[in-house]
Regions:
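Short alpha-helical transmembrane segments in multi-pass integral membrane proteins
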Residues: 1-22, 77-142, 186-241, 304-370, ...
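Residue-level signal for short hydrophobic patches within transmembrane helices
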Residues: 12-31, 35, 58-65, 141, ...
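Transmembrane helical elements of multi-pass membrane transporters/channels
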Residues: 17-36, 138, 172, 201-205, ...
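Transmembrane alpha-helix boundary and packing residues in multipass membrane permease domains
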Residues: 22, 26, 38, 42, ...
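Helix-terminus/linker motif at the lipid-water interface of multi-pass membrane proteins
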Residues: 31-50, 119-126, 182-189, 251-282, ...
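Small-residue-rich hydrophobic transmembrane alpha-helices
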Residues: 49-109, 146-165, 258, 278-342, ...
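Hydrophobic transmembrane alpha-helices of multi-pass small-molecule transporters
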Residues: 61-64, 176-180, 206-210, 288, ...
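Short runs within selected transmembrane alpha-helices of multi-pass transporters and secretion channels
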Residues: 70, 139-157, 165-173, 194-207, ...
């Protein structure tokens, strides 16, 4: 077997080759929702924006499923290849693909069956509900395709082809972007047009991803590779649980935030719908930055996983620290944009009255104040997943959302009203950053002693 370049190539080159396509692919998940929101905001108004925000948890749950199986199987593949166990790698990949399909179909059926109940739980108000139901009932059709595409993109990167992974995701986004204005404005389908454009783009990406099954180079499939094995499935899910649990926590905090904003917003001059619409815009804007961080972390995973499996700990340390530097550059640019140009960013998502822009600007500046450090927690969680310490990775992934943000979102508004919801973000970001630095520092010191 040819020696894998992950074990000897310069780390900076590997990170560039793997992370940049991963960033592009990761951005697509955010772009699907943001492009819809921009066109829907222009065509339908802020109630349309609020509707896509209420439906957004469906996308984050979908991504959580894709990460559970995709990251889990890809991490297993990288570790097995690093240990020179090609048959085990093929089994991990094959079982991962089967799980993606099964989970995708189950998710579609559950979502469509309980749609009205779920939308109300997500915070849909009386005025927003009809738009949200129309949008979500259509976009749920594309969720199984999105799960397989996102999951497969991780396996394709583990196979050493990050550029093809990027192409799969980007082409779907291009189709979506082209169809959005046609369906919304030319065909006059409104919010349904944005939903159908999203689904068609997702199906296109799915077809491209599925074609790669016959192109794997480091993985050689046999029929047995696709026979579902319970033990292997458990290993896959255990390795993907940290990334997935973070997304689940994102979904939970979205639901809590939406309900808190409508409750406390009703007690202010902003009302219920303005905070709901503004929150979604701020979150989806921040999702672009988080997608870049996720892309960097996904790009480092094969590098860290392979070299940890090969016991080349100095390369593990180098890859992690370089990824942190990349993250700080991105976060600095984001901080400047969010603090100095918030109204320009918010205006992209459609018009609104003076109160709408007043609250949206306040939300962006306050909630995203600690964007400089909030990516370190994601990188650190991914780091532990890549080296096979999935429990520690899962716990770290949950720190910001579950241990800090959810309690703060529930408690701070009791003292500060609607401002408490906004202040919860930066406090949680800083707390998670400190914990991440401590845990990774201990692990890197341990690896250094084992060299």
């Amino acid at each position: 077997m040819t020696e894998n370049p992950l074990g000897y190539e310069k780390i900076s080159k590997l990170l560039k080759d793997f992370a940049i396509p991963s960033i592009m692919a990761s951005l697509v998940s955010s772009i699907y929702n943001i492009v819809d929101q921009i066109f829907i905001g222009q065509g339908v108004g802020y109630l349309g924006n609020a509707a896509t925000n209420v439906a957004y948890p469906f996308s984050t749950i979908c991504l959580a499923i894709a990460l559970l199986v995709g990251i889990g199987s890809a991490s297993r593949v990288s570790l097995c290849l690093g240990r020179k166990e090609p048959k085990a790698a093929a089994k991990a990949a094959g079982n991962g693909i089967v799980l993606m399909g099964i989970f995708g179909i189950i998710y579609l059926l559950v979502g469509e069956t309980f749609l009205p109940l779920l939308l109300k739980a997500f915070g849909a108000t009386t005025d927003v509900f009809p738009y949200a139901k129309q949008y979500a009932s259509i976009t749920l059709i594309g969720m199984p395709f999105l799960i397989v595409t996102n999951g497969m993109s991780n396996l394709i990167r583990a196979d050493g082809k990050p550029k093809y992974s990027m192409v799969c995701m980007v082409m779907g986004a291009i189709i979506n972007t082209i169809l959005d204005p046609i369906f919304i404005f030319v065909c006059d389908w409104g919010i349904a047009g944005g939903a159908w454009a999203t689904v068609i783009g997702q199906i296109f990406s799915f077809i491209l991803a599925l074609r790669y099954l016959w192109r794997f180079q480091t993985i050689h499939f046999e029929k047995e590779s696709f026979l579902l094995d319970i033990k292997e499935s458990m290993k896959i899910c255990s390795m993907g649980i940290s990334s997935s649990s973070n997304q689940i926590a994102v979904t939970v905090i979205q639901i809590i935030q939406y309900n808190s904003l409508t409750y406390y917003g009703a007690l202010t001059k902003y009302g219920t719908d303005i905070p709901l619409a503004a929150c979604g815009i701020v979150m989806k804007t921040n999702a672009i930055i988080l997608a870049i961080v996720v892309g960097i972390s996904q790009g480092t995973q094969p590098i860290i996983g392979f070299n940890y499996g090969a016991r080349q700990y100095h390369r593990v340390r180098e890859a992690y620290l370089l990824a942190v530097k990349w993250n700080l550059v991105v976060s600095t640019i984001a901080f400047i944009a969010f603090q100095f140009f918030p109204q320009s960013i918010i205006s992209l998502f459609g018009d609104g009255n003076e109160l709408y822009f007043e609250f949206a600007v306040l939300f962006m500046r306050t909630y995203l104040f600690m964007v400089l450090v909030n990516g370190v927690q994601l990188l650190s969680s991914s780091f532990f997943t890549a080296i096979g310490k999935s429990l520690k990775g899962a716990l770290l992934a949950l720190t910001r959302q579950t241990f800090f943000l959810i309690p703060l979102t529930l408690l701070l508004p009791l003292r500060f009203g609607i401002m408490g919801v906004l202040l919860a973000g930066p406090v949680a970001d800083f707390s998670a950053f400190v914990l991440s630095v401590v845990l990774v520092g201990i692990e890197l010191k341990k690896q250094k002693n084992d060299m």
